[in-house]
Amino acid sequence: MTASSGGYQGWERRNNNIPETVGILFLQVRAVSSGKKAAQCRETAPTAGLSESSRPRLFAMDYSKGSKKRKAITKDVDEDPSVVSGDEYDLEALDRNDSDSSADASDSEIELIGDFSSDDGEDDDGEDDDELDSDEVPSDTEPFARVKSGNIATGLDGSLDGESNDLSDDNEPNYRIEKDANGNDRYIYPEINPDDNSEYSEVDEEANTIGDIPLSFYDQYPHIGYNINGKKILRPAKGQALDALLDSIEIPKGWTGLTDPSTGKPLQLSQEELELLRKVQMNEITQDGYDPYQPTIEYFTSKQEIMPLSAAPEPKRRFIPSKHEAKRVMKIVKAIREGRILPYKPPEEEDATQEGIQTYDLWADESPRPDHPMNIPAPKLPPPGYEESYHPPPEYLPDKKEKEEWENQDEEDREREYLPTDYSTLRKVPGYERFVKEKFERCLDLYLAPRVRRSKLNIDPESLLPKLPSPEELKPFPTTCATLFRGHRGRVRSLAIDPTGVWLASGGDDGTVRVWELLTGRQLWSVKLSDEDAVNVVRWRPGKEAVVLAASVGDSIYLAVPDVVNLELEAASLEVIDAGWGYATSTGTSTTKKTSPVQWTRPASSLADSGVYAVIPLGYIAKSISWHRRGDYFVTVCPGTSTPASVAIAIHTLSKHLTQYPFRRRLKGGGSPQVAHFHPSKPILFVANQRSIRAYDLSRQTLVKILRPGARWISSFDIHPTSSSTSGGDNLIVGSYDRRLLWHDVDLSDRPYKTLRYHQKAIRAVKYHPHYPLFADTSDDGSLQIFHGSVTGDLLSNANIVPLKVLKGHKVTGDLGVLDLDWHPREAWCVSAGADGTCRLWM
C-alpha cells in the first residue's frame, strides 16, 4: 500500500485542481490491483468453486450528491460448502460496504475503463450488466470490465467494525460468513498488516503511507500524508515555548526530544527500545541467551605431524575402472545412438532478410598483411600515478602558494599540465578540460615523432650469480649424528679428539674431565679436578709419540696422562712431563737469569693416582689453550677484565716447565685479548682481542699484520691448516658474538673476504678440518653449519666457499646452544659439545 499511496502523492502534486474524491477512488483501484496479486499467492480461496462468469470484477465508489459511501458490485452465487479457505487474507478494506448506499445507485454513474493488474492486456467490452461479488479479488486471467454505476448493487445493511477475529482457538475458522445485499454469503477475513511478519497482526489505520517521499513535499499542505483508508493525516499542532519548557521539565518515560518524521508527533520509545539502548551504551550483549565465551572447537592441532596418519597401501579400487560410471556412460551412449540426446545442437541461424537488416563481412576481401620489417610499435603511455587520482594523498595536493606559482608559469615551463585536485567521491569529478588537446597531441606524437629502436641488454639474472658446485659433488662431509656421549652434569664446555682419532676428551661444569671411545661412546677414564670450578678448556698435545692432555680448571692448568694407552706410550708420556722437573732443578742451582714467574707444581696424591702429573697455577681463569705444532709449547689466554695486561697471555714450555709473558702492555685498541693460536708452519703468533687480530713474529719480536674483521666481539678464530708455503696460514675464519662468520685472506686485505650471516644467535666456535677442505661453526641457536672452503696456491684465484649442511640435534639450554667442536684428524667427522650436557659425533 505504501508504493501505491506514494505514487498518488506525486500525481496529486502535479494535479492540484483534481477533486479529492477522484484521488481516493484512484487509491481504492490501486488497492484492488495490489490485492489481486496477493490473492495469487493463496493456495485455496473461497472463489475456487465459482464459475468464471460469477467471479468478482470490480468495486466502485459513488460520490454523487456528496455521498462518500462505497457500493459493492455483486452477483448471486450459490453457497458451496466445500470451498473453505485455510489462509488468512485481508479484504476488509476492499469489501467494506454501507447499507444505505443502494438508494443512491441510480443518481450518478461512474465508469472505470482499463485493466490495472491483468496479464492479458485485453478489454472485455462485450460483457456488460454482469453483477460481481463484492468480497473477492479478480483472478489473473480476467481483466477488469467496464462497470457502470447503474449496475452496482446496494451496500450492506450494516457496516463492518474492521476489527480482527480472535484466532486463539485453532479449531475456529479464520473467517466469518455474513450476508451481502443480495442475500449471498460473504467471507470476511481479518486484516493483515503488510509491514509485519505475522499475518495476524492488527493494522495501524493511523499509520502514514507516503513511503519514502520526504515530508518537505507537504510543507504547503495542512496535512502530512494519508492513512491506509486514504484519509488525510492532519499536521499536529505545535506547542508554544512555554509548553516546550514544561515538557523539558516533566520528562515522561521514553521521551527523546525528537520528532517522528512520519507523523510529526514527539517520538516515544518503548520499554524494549530503552532496554536495547541501555545495553548498547553499557557495551553489553543485546541478544538474550547469547554466550560470547563458548568453548572453542579446535579443528586443527598446533602440532605438525611428519608421518602420515595412515600408511595403509592404496586399495585396488583406485586403479581399476569404475563399473558404476561405466553403466552411466553406456546409458548416455545408448541415448545418443537412439537420438534421444543430441551431442551437438547447431545454433539457430537468424534470417536477417526477414528482419530487413543487411549484414556483410567487413574483412571478407582482405587478407592479413605482415608488419613492415622496420615497423616499430608505438610507445605506451606511462601508467597513472598518485597525483592523477581523484582522491590523492595530502602530500600530493598543492597549497595556495604552489597553485599561484603554477598558474603564473607559462604552459611550456610547467612541470605538469594539471594540478592534483581532491574530490570526496568519484561522481563529483567534472569533465577534464584538456582531454581533447591531450588526445590530439598524442596523435601528433604517434605519426610525426620519429621512433628509434634501442637495443636492451637481455641478461639472465642467474648468470650474475657465482656458479657453485652441487653439495653432492663435494662429499664427504658430516650429515647425521652417529654417537651420543652422555655422562656430564651440566654444560659441556669443551672437547677435543686426540691425534690418533681414537679417544675424545671432554670437560664440563661438573669439574670433571672424561675420556671416551670415539666410535662407541663408552667412557674410558675420568678425573674430578674441582668441586666448585668448571673445566673451561681441554686440549690434546699434538704428536703420536706421547699422550698428554691439558685442561684449564679455575685458575690452574692441569697436565694429565689418561690411563687408556699401553704401558710403553704411557711411559713415554710421563717422560715428556717429567723432563721439565729436572730442568727446573738444574736452573735453580745455576746463575742463569731465566726464571719462570709461575712455579709448576706436582698435584696431590689423589690426583696423581688418577693420572694428573703437573699443575700450573696462573692465578687467573684461562679460557683458551692452543698447542704449537711440535707439541713443546702451548699458549693460554685469560680474557677476564680483572686480569692484568702483562699476564693475560702466557706461553708455556713443556720440556722446561717454563712460563713466559711475551706482552708487557695491553694490546692497543680492541679491548682485552680473547683467543691466541700459533701459525701452523711459521713462528707467528696470532692474538685476537675483541675487535681485531694481530700477527706477531716470535723470532723477530715484531708486529707483522693487523686484521680488522669488523665484528663487535670476536669469540673464536682458526687458521687454515695447509702446510703450503704459498697458501699455508694465509686464510683465517673468525666467529663473533654478533652472529657473523668471516673469512679473511691475509694476503688480500686486512678486511674480511666473505661475511656469512646464517645463524640467528651468537657464534661460539669455528674450526678448520686438518686435511679436507671443510670448516664448521657452532652457535647458540643449537645448530652446526658445515661449509666447503677450498684454497689454492694461485694468487689470482680466491677461495671458494659453499654452504653444505646444517646439523641440528642439541637442545638450547639457558640461551646457550653448541659451545665447542672439533674435527677428526683423518675422517670427515666432527664432534660437538652442547649446553644440554651431551656430546655428539657427526658422520
UniProtKB/Swiss-Prot annotation:
Q: Which UniProt keywords apply?
A: Nucleus, Repeat, Ribosome biogenesis, rRNA processing, WD repeat
Q: Which residue ranges contain the repeat WD?
A: 487-526, 530-570, 668-706, 709-754, 758-797, 813-843
- One Pfam entry for this protein is BOP1NT
Q: Which SUPFAM superfamilies match?
A: WD40 repeat-like
The UniProt record lists the keyword Lipid biosynthesis: no
Query: Which compartments does it reside in?
Result: Nucleus, Nucleolus; Nucleus, Nucleoplasm
Query: Pro residues compositional bias: what residue ranges?
Result: 379-396
Query: Which regions are flagged for Acidic residues bias?
Result: 77-92, 106-139, 163-172
Domain of life, source organism = Eukaryota
* Region called Disordered, residue ranges: 36-189, 364-419
Q: In UniProt terms, what function does this protein have? A: Component of the NOP7 complex, which is required for maturation of the 25S and 5.8S ribosomal RNAs and formation of the 60S ribosome.
Similarity-based family: Belongs to the WD repeat BOP1/ERB1 family.
**The protein's name:** Ribosome biogenesis protein ERB1
